[in-house]
Amino acid sequence: MTLYDENNLHIIKDNLRYLKLLSKQYPSISSASSEIINLQAILNLPKGTEHFISDVHGEYESFTHMLKNASGVIKRKIDDVFGTSLRECDKRNLATLIYYPEQKLDLIKKSEKNLEDWYKITLYRLIRLCQIVSSKYTRSKVRKALPSDFAYIIEELLNEQGDRVDKQEYYNSIIETIIDIDRASEFIIAISNVIQRLVVDKLHIIGDIYDRGPGAEIIIEALSKHHSIDIQWGNHDIVWMGAAAGCEACIANVIRISLRYANLSTLEDGYGINLLPLATFAMDFYKEDNCENFKPRTIDKNLNKTDIKLLSKMHKAISIIQFKLEGKIIKRRPEFKMEERLLLDKINIKEGTLNLNEKIYKLIDTNFPTLDKENPYELNERERDLVEKLTNSFINSEKLQRHIKFLYSNGSLYLKYNSNLLYHGCIPLNEDGSLKEVTLCKETLKGKSLLDKLDRLAREAYFFKKDPESKLYGMDMMWYLWCGPNSPLFGKKKMTTFERYFLDDKDTHKEEKNPYYKYRNDEKMCTIIFEEFELDVDNSHIINGHIPVKTKEGENPIKANGKLLVIDGGFCKAYQPQTGIAGYTLIYNSYGLLLTSHEPFSSIHKAIVEGNDILSSTIILEHVSSRKRVLDTDSGEEIKKQIHDLEMLLVAYRKGLIKEENEANIRF
């Protein structure tokens, strides 16, 4: 308390109004002192485990399994606790039981001859494991993680040692009673879920929940139930967020990508988006067009010829609409400097050519039934009606709106957390490696200020419903974040969607990356970024997604001498033949950083029936001799501030500046 002697009393007086409010929560010296003791104790607990996952791309089965096994953390805990006392097959079965308790129990009940014996052994093992994973938390925090049905019993078992002679009968009788009253299955499910929850204290999703995979809505539903999560938006997330906000160009892009990969389940089944008007429109305008270049790219999907024909026509129809809608934004926003993407007016329908950068290219598809030569970016009456119907469908999808609000409330363009800087794409740079200046809303911005501004504009796109002008600019910016040349999410000079559909020349398909990617292995670049974001240069890391790591070509996810880590999760099956693996995830626990590479996941069914887990290899990036504690984290800094405030409150009580509440009043 020496800080608050007579010489520093003015500090307390200056904060008296706040301290009086704080006294409502801690109305006595006793209550304030108790809280200081509690908080000081928390500071000395081990740091909680953080789990970093990126680029999920809608692949819900792989992601669900990764979430359940915490990138191998649960298996490592089983190894730590049971070592050589359990066979490998028993460890594997125990892990699978924790991941999928309901499904695994159904199988065990059918095959196990002595179920009561199995229950007893398994309960002891699960309780022992739960004791270990809960040991780094306060009892209060563990209590909040417990299911109400079994909260008291689990807490008793966690805080008792079964090998203590004086409590052994008590401990054993609880377990035997659980089995006797036929509640063992429910208890196993409950404690397995508690273990899953406690092994990871914080989950970071570094972008691209959405894309071509079939279950983005399933993933977000699961994430919305997670106890502690943050999200750094990816380019595929932002285009869906823009679509939900009502940005027509984003809506067209979302539908086009879904049709390109024959993934309509998220749109139709997940969010109830009605695509029948698009199908009708496509059949009317492209009836005689085989739309060869718009055939869906399918992996593990059996589509009949009729389905492929319809999807191809819908795909082409929405693509042309997309180019028109994008043209309107480009013309409306000259500050975007995207005039070179205005290509519809460069088409010579009669000659079947495109004038691209003063060079004439032959078009491989020359059927443009909805294109007006005089006004190529104008929607015809049928197109305008279709776009309005699709927009209404997106805006009025209750589930989509709920999921996008979740992304807004738990997400941002970047995050500083425990000396790590998390973002999906890049920080735009110049060719010389300096931070690139970008002019938006008559402001010239770069680095952190640029991302902060873009983050605010993205929120205005969704929430500024009573300010149409700001909302429209925000929606246009959402589209820019998807494909603009200085977008930190896109990270490329241009998106050559039109060229890939209509030109054979592969050179026109190239998408030049921002210089950021050239400098990713340069520690100087990391230093520039750390200083820009006010992070400790010596002890910070950039954790990045977006670009798959081509492991089979020898690429290393560890860049700039460990300052930058690329953890594209590799969930997207289309990239796996190129990368050679199924991507990387990161674990940051009290002992250091662990980078885990993963082999492709077979299926949840095989995981349950055969005990197949994702095969993973772990690299220890950093290992500390002394475990990191809560006091070394951002949460620790907040707790220190709380302690500081409570110490001021104690002095205020003791100096008579604030009166303690009568103990009787406090109690009654």
Swiss-Prot record:
InterPro entries according to UniProt: FBPtase_class3, Metallo-depent_PP-like
Entry's Gene Ontology molecular function annotations: fructose 1,6-bisphosphate 1-phosphatase activity
Top-level EC class: hydrolase
Lineage of origin: Bacteria, Bacillati, Bacillota, Clostridia, Eubacteriales
GO BP terms, alphabetized: gluconeogenesis
UniProt xrefs under SUPFAM superfamilies: Metallo-dependent phosphatases (SSF56300)
EC number annotated for this UniProt entry: 3.1.3.11
Naturally occurring in which organism (per UniProt): Clostridium botulinum (strain Loch Maree / Type A3)
Recorded catalytic activity of this chain's protein: beta-D-fructose 1,6-bisphosphate + H2O = beta-D-fructose 6-phosphate + phosphate
One Pfam entry name: FBPase_2
Pathway(s) of this molecule: Carbohydrate biosynthesis; gluconeogenesis
Protein name, as recorded: Fructose-1,6-bisphosphatase class 3
Keywords noted in UniProt: Carbohydrate metabolism, Hydrolase, Manganese
Gene behind the chain: fbp
Entry cofactors: Mn(2+)
